[in-house]
Amino acid sequence: MVYHDLIRRPVTTEKTTLQKETANQVTFEVDRRANRVEIKRAVEQVFNAKVAAVNTATVKGKKKRMGRNIGKRKDWKKAVVTLMPGERIDFFEGV
C-alpha cells in the first residue's frame, strides 16, 4: 500500500485536540485494511515524526434518516498515534 493512501484525514474534535496538547497524541482516520505497523511507517514517512505507539479502533457507522428512509454511515477505522517526546505534527497552526 502507498503510505499517502493509508492516512485519510486527521480527526479534529475537542477530545483529540486535548489529547494533542496534553498527551502528545494525534488521531487519524485511516484505511480499514491498515494495521498498526503500516500506520506507524506511514506517519513517520509522511510527517517526519517518530512514533512511540499506535492504538486502533473500528468505529461503527451511525444510523441516519432522511424522511422515511433509514440509512447507515460507513464504518471507519481510527488510529490514535502517540508521538515520541519532543515530536510534533502541525495541521492548522499558523492559519
UniProtKB/Swiss-Prot annotation:
InterPro entries named in the record: Nucleotide-bd_a/b_plait_sf (IPR012677), Ribosomal_uL23-like (IPR013025), Ribosomal_uL23/eL15/eS24_sf (IPR012678)
Keyword rRNA processing tagged: no
GO terms (BP aspect): translation
Oligomer and partners: Part of the 50S ribosomal subunit. Contacts protein L29, and trigger factor when it is bound to the ribosome.
Family recorded in the similarity comment: Belongs to the universal ribosomal protein uL23 family.
Function text: One of the early assembly proteins it binds 23S rRNA. One of the proteins that surrounds the polypeptide exit tunnel on the outside of the ribosome. Forms the main docking site for trigger factor binding to the ribosome.
PANTHER family to which the protein is assigned, alphabetical: 60S RIBOSOMAL PROTEIN L23A
Name of this chain's protein: Large ribosomal subunit protein uL23
Gene: rplW
